[in-house]
């Protein structure tokens, strides 16, 4: 609802929004009335600097940017994380135990979720580099948990890890994790980084596709964007277990709570055709996400 109001305020109306408008009569009439009431305030036309300033603030509130900034500031100044506990855990771990290594990284991410405080990681880069393969993917993605909502600095923070045209680029696990982290930072922001992630899912590497798909699903969550859904569906039907599972979950996130019947039919139809259990599991989750909150429908 808030996303539709925001689009009305900014004058943007995508094809997917038009399709959604056609199928939701009464709700859209209410949205249009609400938007019209904001666009046409009483007084002298309502187009002065004060009006524009208020409209900009309203857009930020509806988009979630203002609440996110407030949460970010609050969590930063009220963080009570005890780094000595993490240091003690790290020092007592066996050097080659990958399970406890990644568990420590994840516990740090949870302890500092949304605070933007990543001092422990910066002070222990050599120890952090011991992560390999999917552990490296998870370790890089944990940056997104710590910096959740840090929109302005997201690309700058992740630049060293994101895919680039350089032949001596990072590990695909690190790049995939960085794309997932980007999605975690921009989760539910209406698709602000969608175009960047849409380019990334075109990669031929399944690990990068995995991370980019999850990131795209998070940043475009509940937008109901059929174009993004179709791009993700193309990855699903490519029948790669690693990228297909992530794309399935991402497709469900994009259509969260929309009850998109055509998408559900296509997903279930493909679930009967594929032999990959990961894709079947991902599709099952996607169907649940698409029908989220629609038990009465």
Named regions from a protein language model:
Residues 3-13, 17-19, 23-297:
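Alpha-solenoid helical-repeat scaffolds
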């Amino acid at each position: 609802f808030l996303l539709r109001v925001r689009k009305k305020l900014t004058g943007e109306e995508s094809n997917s929004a038009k399709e959604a408008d056609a199928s939701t009569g009464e709700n859209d009439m209410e949205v249009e009335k609400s938007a019209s009431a904001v666009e046409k305030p009483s007084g002298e036309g309502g187009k002065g600097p004060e009006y524009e300033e208020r409209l900009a603030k309203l857009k930020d509130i509806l988009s979630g940017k203002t609440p996110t900034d407030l949460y970010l500031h609050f969590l930063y100044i009220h963080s009570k994380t005890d780094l000595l506990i993490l240091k003690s855990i790290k020092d007592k771990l066996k050097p080659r135990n990958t399970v406890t290594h990644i568990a420590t990284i994840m516990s740090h991410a949870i302890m500092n979720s949304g605070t933007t405080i990543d001092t422990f990681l910066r002070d222990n880069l050599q120890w952090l580099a011991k992560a390999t393969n999917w552990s490296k993917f998870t370790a890089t993605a944990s940056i997104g948990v710590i910096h959740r909502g840090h929109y302005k600095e997201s690309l700058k923070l992740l630049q060293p890890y994101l895919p680039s045209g350089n032949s001596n680029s990072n590990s695909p696990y690190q790049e995939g994790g960085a794309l997932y982290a980007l999605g975690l930072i921009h989760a539910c922001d209406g698709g602000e980084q969608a175009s960047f992630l849409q380019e990334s899912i075109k990669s031929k590497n399944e690990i990068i596709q995995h991370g980019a798909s999850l990131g795209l699903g998070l940043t475009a969550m509940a937008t109901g964007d059929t174009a993004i859904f179709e791009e993700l569906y193309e990855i699903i039907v490519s029948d790669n277990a690693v990228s297909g599972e992530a794309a399935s979950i991402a497709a469900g996130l994009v259509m969260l709570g929309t009850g998109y019947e055509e998408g559900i039919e296509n997903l279930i139809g493909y679930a009967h055709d594929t032999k990959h259990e990961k894709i079947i599991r991902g599709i099952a989750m996607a169907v649940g996400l698409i029908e989220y909150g629609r038990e009465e429908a």
